Amino acid sequence: MKIAMLAPLWKTVPPQKYGGTELVASLITEELVKLGHEVTLFACGGSNTSAKLVEVIDRPMYDILGGFKFDAIQFYDFMEVKMAFDAAKAGDFDIIHNHMGLAIAALGNISPVPMITTNHSSLPPDFEPLSRLASDCNYISISDSQRSMAPYLNYIATVYHGIRTDQIEFKADSGDYLLFLATMSEQKGVDRAIEIAKRTGMKMKMAGNITDEKYFETIKPLIDGEQISYIGEVDLQ
């Protein structure tokens, strides 16, 4: 099968450090190639893949903009979709797998070939009006619980995020501390994780880049460097 993978342009695929969606898109792409499919990955420059790589821009948008600025990336998102749709019209693809988010999902009905969208994030408050217009497009949920946020969408399957077991070693015995691995932002629930650590009396290490400086300042007094410590952004190693 000839498959187009549409990855976000924020980070390289796979990411050097933070980039959950980019990591999952990379894992799926590499496994599809191993299965013998003809895969084309649309992503930013600097990405590394065994599939055919189409560089939509020469470097990550996060580096170009100096952070996440969603209004500024919309033009490049639609440029990526246009490139994929044009290639699909030329017969290059049998299917398109969208990892770019919910706005792109709404274009599913005008795609030259079948398109499926995996939603890797929570649903924004203003998603419902748009999504109802595209409720008959094809979606993959990352958990059955996620479906409850928009039960009216046309879900094809639930596919949980996977990991490379050769990179993340399983240990039967638990450690002596909690680990919080996510961006330092309100939507990730950092404050709730700290509350759990405080209530259980366990130490907690927090790792991830700070995407909301204002919010981070509100939790900073709770980080004492002993029970609660912040170690910054980390990679898979």
Tell me the role of every PLM-derived stretch.
Residues 1-237:
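Catalytic cores of nucleotide-sugar-dependent glycosyltransferases that transfer UDP/GDP/TDP-activated
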